[in-house]
């Protein structure tokens, strides 16, 4: 497998695949952050998480088209407007879903899984009816096109660098909200002991609703970022939902650091193996490795201790 390449060729290949893995890592982190908040903090298995991501992608696509026709002078910075709208739309829909559906199914994981899976099918059909079955893509601003020539053999796309920078900023913001804000302290109090948190005056229902909305809103941002590197279709979210659950479970539920470490290891392993093997074989080997590790450490790499 490696005999056909010189050392310099292998170095360039590993560097390029490593950067491709970083782009995949960025998508995984943005998706997994929202899912880790919902699954790790609330214990809800949200099978419709990918559809909240696609809602953010469609909002970005609509914003791109609207800005080009109504206010073309805003086009170079339309993505920042679209990202805010994507977060708002996905977060608002998430809060509505929590109020109408999820709050009735707490402590019933199988019912929650079935209900959110049905919701994912409903949302897919809704997207197909409104936007059509064909995939759509956004037009990138001129400053986001092209690539940076790192070396003679290594080119790094600018849009990929932008997605990685966005991921870093969102991760820092989420860490601040969860660990240093007063609302984040309430969330962690509810996770540690829901009954005691309610006894000291924390509105646990409100915390649940805003937590679910935040997780879905971050998925919307992930969808917005996804449009920078790929096209969007009604079922595109299903391509990432399994990998995202793997990231969360492998890293350890409710562990922000575990989510990041897990996303990095999975994306880098998968991206590197894809060059030397087929994409399907890379996924199989990655999955088998994760299963083997989880058999030894079923709580994940960095699981948090939770008081019962």
Predicted regions and their residues:
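Membrane-interfacial amphipathic/re-entrant helices at transmembrane-helix boundaries
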Residues: 1-31, 59, 71-82, 108-113, ...
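Single transmembrane alpha-helix segments in multi-pass membrane proteins
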Residues: 15-63, 96, 100-111, 128, ...
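Short, non-helical or kinked segments that cap or interrupt transmembrane helices
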Residues: 37-58, 107-112, 183-186, 209-210, ...
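Transmembrane helix-bundle core of multi-pass membrane transporters
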Residues: 104-105, 112-180, 207-210, 272, ...
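Pore- or pathway-lining transmembrane helices of multi-pass membrane proteins that form conduits
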Residues: 51-58, 103-128, 237-249, 265, ...
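Inter-helical junctions in multi-pass inner-membrane proteins, predominant
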Residues: 13-20, 174-182, 208-254, 270-283
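Helix-loop-helix "hairpin" substructures at the membrane interface of multi-pass membrane proteins
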Residues: 153-232, 256-261
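Alpha-helical transmembrane segments within multi-pass membrane transporters and channels
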Residues: 70-119, 126, 173, 261-266, ...
């Amino acid at each position: 497998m490696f005999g056909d390449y010189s050392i310099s060729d292998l170095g360039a290949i590993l560097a390029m695949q490593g950067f491709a893995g970083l782009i995949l890592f960025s998508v995984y982190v943005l998706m997994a952050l929202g899912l880790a908040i919902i699954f790790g903090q609330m214990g809800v298995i949200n099978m419709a998480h990918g559809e909240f991501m696609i809602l953010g992608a469609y909002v970005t696509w609509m914003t791109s088209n609207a800005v080009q026709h109504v206010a073309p002078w805003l086009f170079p910075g339309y993505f920042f407007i679209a990202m805010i709208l994507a977060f708002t739309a996905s977060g608002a829909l998430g809060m509505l879903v929590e109020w109408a559906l999820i709050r009735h199914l707490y402590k019933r994981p199988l019912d929650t899984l079935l209900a959110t899976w049905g919701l994912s099918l409903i949302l897919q059909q809704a997207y197909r009816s409104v936007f059509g079955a064909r995939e759509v893509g956004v037009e990138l601003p001129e400053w986001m096109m092209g690539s940076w020539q790192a070396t003679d053999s290594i080119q790094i796309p600018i849009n990929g660098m932008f997605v990685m920078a966005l991921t870093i900023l969102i991760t820092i913001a989420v860490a601040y909200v969860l660990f240093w804000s007063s609302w984040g302290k309430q969330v962690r109090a509810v996770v540690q002991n829901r009954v005691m948190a309610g006894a000291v005056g924390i509105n646990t229902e409100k915390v649940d609703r805003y937590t679910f909305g935040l997780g879905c809103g971050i998925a919307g941002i992930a969808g917005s970022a996804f449009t920078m590197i790929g096209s969007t279709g009604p079922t595109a979210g299903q391509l990432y939902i399994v990998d995202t659950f793997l990231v969360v479970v492998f890293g350890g539920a409710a562990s922000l650091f575990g989510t990041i470490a897990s996303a990095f290891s999975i994306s880098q392993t998968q991206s590197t193996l894809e060059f030397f093997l087929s994409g399907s074989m890379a996924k199989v080997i990655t999955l088998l490795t994760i299963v083997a590790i989880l058999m030894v450490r079923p709580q994940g790499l960095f699981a948090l201790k939770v008081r019962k």
